[in-house]
């Protein structure tokens, strides 16, 4: 059974907590489907080419129908001309969204957690809170404190997951390139797969791993 590593307030290992046994039997295909759904939903539908009705020009017949020895032509907007319209080109009314079931979303997230736990890259801490130092009625050194937390983990990049995240903690991590902090309500399988390590608050971890099969 896979386990998440429990860290103390100094981010040193002090124990472990088991993931639900049902996670072991989840198929990896659920994660593939969710990542495909996530990326397709984020795709901007901007590709657009003009057809022969949309290009400018073509108001008159380019040359006489007969007698010139050339193939007949009615308009320079025809796709056979350089600068003419495009046949079967891209349109900007295509919907790239791919449907995925609610159950598959949950299974994908659970599989991603299982993968992180097997790789010893899933960590649980009691609380993720950055308070900084109050100077002149302003909170300062927020990013410095957040960076110290990240450096103490000794990981390549890290996803931090909070339960009811406060504005100072969110602000503290916003300028760190190799970190991302999200509230548990925003957590998804794509984010779990995108980062090499994950640090979760204990409350957020319990919220995610609770049995939701009856919902």
Curated annotation (Swiss-Prot):
Keywords: Ribonucleoprotein, Ribosomal protein, RNA-binding, rRNA-binding
Record bears the keyword rRNA-binding: yes
Stretches for region Disordered: 46-72
One Gene Ontology MF term: rRNA binding
This protein's GO CC annotations: ribonucleoprotein complex; ribosome
Keyword Electron transport tagged: no
Pfam families noted in UniProt: Ribosomal_L4
Amino acid composition bias (Gly residues), ranges on this chain: 56-71
GO biological process: translation
Subunit structure: Part of the 50S ribosomal subunit.
NCBIfam families: rplD_bact (TIGR03953)
Function of the molecule: One of the primary rRNA binding proteins, this protein initially binds near the 5'-end of the 23S rRNA. It is important during the early stages of 50S assembly. It makes multiple contacts with different domains of the 23S rRNA in the assembled 50S subunit and ribosome. Forms part of the polypeptide exit tunnel.
Name of the protein this chain belongs to: Large ribosomal subunit protein uL4
Gene name as annotated: rplD
